[in-house]
């Protein structure tokens, strides 16, 4: 049986720098930064988008807490921001294999829950990742049911 495990919580604040400053003042001192370029689809429309990602591993018991700041291109939050505004919890995420993702796709399809955004990352600036791996991100449009979207993250190691 499939089981969703929250491994990542992401927020999309109006002012990412101010949000990070406040979180640092609250004890989240160490951040890992990455600028990502990705291509794929947002609600079925082909896109390329860019985002600044900031990760902290202290706030959430060693799991990922992410500040998401889209800088270029269309993204699924742009659609949701029309009704929900920019300050939001972006998603709850889980890492999985490509095989597990196939099962999750079927699970959500059977419940008429659409893919909000699916992208493959083209580039990363984080030296731990850059040139070594990419990701397939699939975000399901569960915001109207759960109040937040669900993201499945597949690591793709480069050989």
Spans of features found by a protein language model:
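Long, hydrophobic N-terminal alpha-helical segment
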Residues: 1-49
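Short, composition-biased local secondary-structure segments
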Residues: 23-26, 69-76
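A cross-kingdom feature marking solvent-exposed beta-strand/loop segments within repeated
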Residues: 32-50, 73-82, 121-136
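Histidine- and/or cysteine-centered catalytic micro-motif in compact active-site loops
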Residues: 36, 68-72, 97
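Extended intrinsically disordered, low-complexity coil regions enriched in Ser, Thr, Gly, Ala
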Residues: 16-35, 82-87, 97-122
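Vicinal oxygen chelate
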Residues: 2, 6-14, 54-69, 79-100, 105-159
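Short loop/beta submotifs within extracellular cysteine-rich repeat domains
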Residues: 30-31, 75-76, 145-150
